[in-house]
Amino acid sequence: MGGVFKLFISRAFESLLGPTSVMALRFHVERRLGRDMYEVFYEDPGRFYKVLRELLGSGAEMLMRLVARWLNENGYMEGLDPDKFIELLEKGGEEAAERMRRAIKPPYRR
């Protein structure tokens, strides 16, 4: 469930941070979450973001703004700008998760 969503989120992280940094980030985030960070992001983005803030402090917001911008620029997200993306992460809950799931999708073919 959410395989395409998780693929695009992982592409964003790898593109922005590089594979080695993503591996380190995943280690620390997944140690706190007890499971795959991309699965948690899909199911409960607020919980994911809370853990990311615990680890990175104010850098978590900067990173997630970059992720949102990357998703938009590469055609993987529609209808959410970085400000709204952060607002949904901070809000959390099922409604926020569903809004993100609808916004993140394969890019349109031209």
Regions found by a protein language model. Give the residues of each.
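Conserved mixed alpha/beta catalytic, RNA-binding, or beta-rich assembly cores of soluble enzyme
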Residues: 3-6, 10-14, 18-30, 34, ...
